[in-house]
């Protein structure tokens, strides 16, 4: 069946392959400009010493007093372009700090489905994971997936469309976020 329950989803991750649509529940904020990395480095507790183009990382944002504000996955798409993906609290904190600080950045939000004024996303996000994920990805791309360290971005083609794939897993099996 197309949809059953959480237990079947978990078993697919462990025994075959699961395909998740993550487009509906997380906002993406694109941060562009010469201060993009500096702004996110200021807001996140993570080190940015090894962060660069075609890399991603789990980012944790705290207030100046150390209280947790939010978290998400941060992608470096180009030297001066980042994308933050996650729940709304981190995006609100990012937007507030960009507005009140002296940062040379522009922000573009692609809100999750129910709050998106356009009624659709500009970018959709999916997770493919499980022991059979490499075979499925090879079938979709026509070639074995290139190997990359965890959280590195790969550029692949599926059905003639450019797709960015992040080597990533939630359950310890092979997986990619597309």
Predicted feature descriptions by range:
Residues 1-177:
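Glycine/proline-enriched, intrinsically flexible loops and inter-domain linkers
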């Amino acid at each position: 069946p197309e949809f059953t329950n959480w237990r079947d989803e978990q078993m697919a991750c462990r025994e075959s392959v699961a395909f998740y649509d993550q487009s509906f529940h997380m906002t993406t904020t694109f941060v562009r400009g010469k201060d993009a990395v500096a702004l996110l480095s200021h807001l996140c507790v993570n080190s940015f010493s090894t962060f660069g183009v075609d890399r991603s990382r789990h980012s944790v944002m705290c207030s100046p007093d150390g209280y947790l504000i939010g978290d998400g996955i941060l992608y470096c798409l180009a030297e001066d372009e980042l994308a933050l993906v996650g729940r709304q609290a981190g995006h609100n904190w990012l937007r507030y700090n960009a507005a009140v600080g002296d940062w040379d950045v522009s922000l573009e939000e692609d809100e999750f489905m129910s709050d998106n004024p356009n009624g659709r996303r500009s970018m959709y996000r999916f997770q493919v994971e499980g022991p059979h994920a490499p075979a499925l990805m090879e079938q979709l791309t026509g070639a074995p997936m290139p190997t990359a360290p965890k959280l590195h971005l790969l550029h692949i083609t599926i059905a003639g469309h450019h797709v960015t794939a992040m080597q990533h897993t939630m359950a310890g099996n092979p997986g990619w976020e597309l």
